[in-house]
Curated annotation (Swiss-Prot):
It comes from Pleuronectes platessa. The record marks D197 as: Required for specificity. Residues 1-15 form the signal peptide. Its EC number is 3.4.21.4. The active site is at H62 (charge relay system), D106 (charge relay system), S203 (charge relay system). This is Trypsin.
Amino acid sequence: MRLLALLLMVGAAVAVPREDGRIIGGHECAAHSRPFMASLNYGYHFCGGVLINNQWVLSVAHCWYNPYAMQVMLGEHDLRKFEGTEQLMKTDTIIWHPNYDYQTLDLTSCSSSSTILWKVTHAVAPIPLPTSCPVAGTPCSVSGWGNTARDGDEVYLPTLLQCMDVPIVDEEQCMKSYPDMISPRMVCAGFMDGSRDACNGDSGSPLVCRGEVYGLVSWGQGCAQPNYPGVYVKLCEFLGWIERTLEAYP
């Protein structure tokens, strides 16, 4: 059985990809309450991802500097210790979206195989793709293991999975925050007062709304900055490509 990872990123040339990532203003998730959460790592956590079916993980392409050395860990909560719930996969194939462009449209898929076969448990389970596009004000949540310190503070990387509730930001407000940088493939979420945000190391982590994954942490202006909400990949815009890719690798 293969585990396949599908990677997407929508960014802008002057934006800051959130490679080191963080959840600012969040709290520890209930253990294994996000069974779809994946940790991408090179022996240490580097980016997030999300399990979307029995063999695919979704994340953002800018996380994969050396994809063949990357491991995909499922069933994690506490990164410090072995909990007995973890299931590990390794990458063996990368497939780029035909319109790949790091500055504007960055989509990649990679397939992985392992002698360790993952199975659904209380700690490992997929989440559905969106059945609609996000609407302003929709309550959502984001999770990750990224830095929890604000800009200018000493970096603090939590070992316990962090969660945070965020609303979808109105498209007009999103475009005002990032003039000429927001495309139809992006969606903003967060608080305009800068009180809560996802950031670097949380890249690729899922934005979950109404039990479906609506977006992936992508980029932003700093972290938890007033008037600059987080920018996410808008997954509803990529459903056709995702479905075609999954069909090509049954």
